């Protein structure tokens, strides 16, 4: 599809992507402390030197130097171009890739920023936590949580809080100018009355449940009312960072407790998740006011081989289970397992696990959980009685098209055989039925009863098949890094050839050029030296003022330095690899990686002085360039057209020229 991919979409996509999930779906990772390790997929090795950091969301190989974020990994591992890699990750996240036409934008690199909603939501969570500890009206919330048997430790682990009664507690605490209020609306923290324009807190007099994404960032809230207000449970609305059909409450907390989960239990509510955790069962998650979707299933199967659905035994619970089964079937590969556990009428996981304890609840799972195939045929036989010919015909009509959705060949074949045994139809007849849609089933159920609320990677603002930036020649006066050996003998990600500016940069052909003769030199340009210094000493960025005024559009190296400064000023904790990963697959990224790998020759005591000498020179060069451009413009005019200021500029120029010795 033609058109540009907006940078905001790339940022959102990376924010919703867990690099551990992406990498582990392609190579086998082993937990090593906080990180994961493996033998590098990009070069041959016997001892693992490839590391994936879930906290920093990047990978790095200490053997060959390969590194980047999730998008870069997909590009290099799957040998995809940038747009195709974006499509791959977007498909995984259940997102459609938008495209926009280029609209007269310049080529100046601009840094993406994390959504401002994340710190705002985090601040709101802290406000709710403090209110649970100290607000005068907290007693009802504390009593509710104690009544559910929760300890302070569990409340801390899940970040539980309290939204006090009143219309503007959070508004007064976090509110500010119109931009801040707009951000609070965008984050779903405030509601605006469409008639009066009045804004007020969305959550009032509720126990608060922060909802986290796979990286632990707070993206939304759920609130359980303490009084008689409706609805009983209220979720945040859809926002730029929260998409309820994809997120699962408690998934982050479950993985924090055990990164090597082999099964995840899906329950219906926040309190079910928390009550199970209180009793030592730390693998439960819950959907957020929606039925279990295919996106939920895909996400869970990327993490674990087995899913257990645990629902109430009432009609609503059984309807929810069937809808979950319908979402499971198209994703049920051989080797994956799904089970269903129904609790006694009037019980839910919260009440039952508190009544009988962890051991008895686990025994219940072992003894009573039904395999998917057993549950599937049991439910259909309740609707179509196989004791009659008419019932067998109806059963086959219902079951055959559903079985056809199963991608796992072995399981699909075995379930067809079971259907043949029940109905007496041949496999050929069942295959013919599979291509006919079943009649509407009484198992097609309505929506969930939970009421919802109201409604780094890049050097430019947009992405296309090629980077959108000014020509980027290899720097004069620096030794290029030796290329690492590629894992693919036919395609090298970087062979050292610089772009000569004579033709369009071909990102798709990166690595297909012949390397030029290298001429070692001893002097590195001051701008490149500053870039390298900043990569190794990012704290220096915080001492630079007005970084955006340091570089003219024609100076691509200075522009890159400015981009690094701005990125570090927005997030000072970024590592060298995270910075390099922002430009993965572009000439800037390869230059930064080469600079980062070069031998360090600057005396430590001179680092800061040399760095700020370069910053000063760039600033002076910028001012001089602006003056020269203005002077050229003035000299195009006749003297009578000049303003007094322009005449003064001209006199100053000729005065300086007259007093300066001539140069040959």
From Swiss-Prot:
It catalyses: ssDNA + n NTP = ssDNA/pppN(pN)n-1 hybrid + (n-1) diphosphate. GO terms for cellular component: cytoplasm; DNA-directed RNA polymerase complex; primosome complex. Its cofactor is Zn(2+); Mg(2+). GO terms for biological process: DNA replication, synthesis of primer. Binds 1 zinc ion per monomer. GO terms for molecular function: DNA binding; DNA-directed RNA polymerase activity; zinc ion binding. Residues 262-344 form the Toprim domain. Residues 94-115, 483-521 are annotated as: Disordered. The keyword Acetylation does not apply. Mg(2+) 2 binds at residues 312, 314. Residues 94-104, 487-515 have a biased composition (Basic and acidic residues). A zinc finger (CHC2-type) spans 40-64. Disulfide bonds: none annotated. Keywords: DNA replication, DNA-binding, DNA-directed RNA polymerase, Magnesium, Metal-binding, Nucleotidyltransferase, Primosome, Transcription, Transferase, Zinc, Zinc-finger. Mg(2+) 1 binds at residues 268, 312. It comes from the Bacteria. InterPro entries: DNA_helicase_N/primase_C (IPR016136), DNA_primase_core_N_sf (IPR037068), DNA_primase_DnaB-bd (IPR019475), DNA_primase_DnaG (IPR006295), DNA_primase_DnaG_DnaB-bd_dom (IPR013173), DNA_primase_Znf_CHC2 (IPR036977), DnaG_bac (IPR030846), DNAG_N (IPR013264). Its EC number is 2.7.7.101. Monomer. Interacts with DnaB. Contains an N-terminal zinc-binding domain, a central core domain that contains the primase activity, and a C-terminal DnaB-binding domain. RNA polymerase that catalyzes the synthesis of short RNA molecules used as primers for DNA polymerase during DNA replication. This is DNA primase. It comes from Pseudomonas aeruginosa (strain ATCC 15692 / DSM 22644 / CIP 104116 / JCM 14847 / LMG 12228 / 1C / PRS 101 / PAO1). The gene is dnaG.
């Amino acid at each position: 599809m033609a058109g540009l991919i907006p940078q905001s979409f790339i940022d959102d996509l990376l924010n919703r992507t867990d690099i551990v999930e992406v990498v582990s779906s392609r190579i086998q990772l082993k937990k090593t402390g906080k990180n994961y390790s493996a033998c590098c997929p990009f070069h041959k090795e016997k001892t693992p030197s490839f590391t994936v950091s879930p906290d920093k969301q990047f990978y790095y190989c200490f053997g060959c130097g390969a590194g980047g974020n999730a998008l870069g990994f997909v590009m290099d591992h799957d040998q995809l171009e940038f747009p195709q890699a974006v499509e791959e990750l977007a498909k995984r996240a259940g997102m459609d890739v938008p495209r926009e036409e280029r609209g007269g934008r310049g080529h100046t690199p601009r840094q993406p920023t994390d959504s401002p909603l994340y710190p705002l939501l985090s601040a709101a969570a802290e406000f709710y936590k403090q209110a649970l500890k100290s607000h005068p009206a907290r007693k009802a919330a504390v009593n509710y949580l104690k009544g559910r048997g929760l300890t302070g430790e569990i409340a801390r682990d899940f970040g539980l809080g309290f939204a006090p009664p009143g219309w503007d507690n959070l508004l007064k605490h976090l509110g500010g100018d119109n931009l801040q209020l707009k951000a609070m609306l965008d984050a779903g923290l405030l509601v605006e009355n469409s008639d009066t324009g009045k804004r007020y807190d969305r959550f009032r007099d509720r126990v608060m449940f922060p909802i986290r994404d796979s990286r632990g960032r707070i993206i939304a809230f759920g609130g359980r009312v303490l009084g008689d207000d409706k609805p009983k449970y209220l979720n945040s609305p859809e926002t730029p960072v929260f998409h309820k059909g994809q997120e699962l409450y408690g998934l982050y907390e479950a993985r924090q407790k055990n990164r090597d989960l082999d099964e995840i239990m899906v329950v219906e509510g926040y309190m079910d998740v928390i009550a199970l955790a209180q009793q030592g069962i730390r693998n439960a998650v819950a959907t957020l006011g929606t039925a279990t979707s295919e996106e939920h299933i895909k996400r869970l199967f990327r993490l674990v081989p087995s899913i257990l659905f645990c629902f109430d035994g009432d009609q609503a619970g059984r309807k929810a289970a069937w809808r979950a089964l319908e979402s499971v079937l198209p994703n049920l590969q051989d080797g994956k397992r799904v089970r269903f556990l129904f609790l006694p009428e009037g019980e839910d996981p919260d009440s039952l696990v508190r009544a009988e304890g962890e051991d008895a609840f686990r025994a219940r799972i072992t003894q009573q959980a039904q395999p998917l195939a057993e549950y599937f045929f049991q439910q259909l036989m309740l609707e179509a009685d196989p004791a009659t010919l008419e019932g067998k015909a109806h059963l086959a009509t219902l079951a055959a098209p559903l079985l056809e959705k199963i991608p796992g060949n072995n399981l699909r074949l075995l379930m067809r055989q079971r259907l043949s045994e029940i109905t007496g139809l041949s496999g050929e007849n069942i295959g013919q039925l599979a291509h006919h849609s079943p009649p509407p089933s009484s198992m097609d159920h309505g929506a969930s009863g939970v009421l919802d609320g109201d409604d780094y990677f890049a050097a430019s603002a947009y992405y296309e098949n090629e980077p959108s930036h000014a020509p980027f020649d290899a720097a004069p006066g620096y030794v290029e890094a030796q290329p690492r050996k590629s894992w693919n003998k036919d395609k090298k990600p970087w062979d050292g050839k610089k772009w000569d500016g004579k033709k369009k940069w071909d990102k798709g052909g990166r690595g297909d050029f012949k390397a030029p003769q290298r001429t070692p030199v001893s002097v590195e340009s001051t701008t490149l030296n500053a870039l390298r210094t900043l990569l190794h000493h990012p704290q220096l960025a915080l001492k630079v003022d007005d970084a955006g005024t340091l570089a003219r559009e024609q100076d691509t190296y200075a522009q890159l330095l400015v981009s690094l400064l701005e990125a570090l000023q927005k997030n000072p904790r970024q590592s060298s690899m995270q910075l390099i990963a922002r430009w993965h697959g572009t000439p800037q990224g390869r230059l930064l990686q080469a600079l980062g790998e070069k031998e360090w020759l600057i005396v430590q005591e001179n680092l800061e002085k040399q760095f700020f000498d370069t910053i000063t020179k760039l600033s002076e060069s910028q001012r001089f360039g602006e003056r020269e451009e203005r002077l050229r413009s003035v000299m195009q005019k006749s003297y009578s057209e000049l303003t007094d200021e322009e005449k003064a500029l001209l006199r100053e120029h000729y005065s300086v020229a007259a007093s300066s010795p001539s140069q040959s």
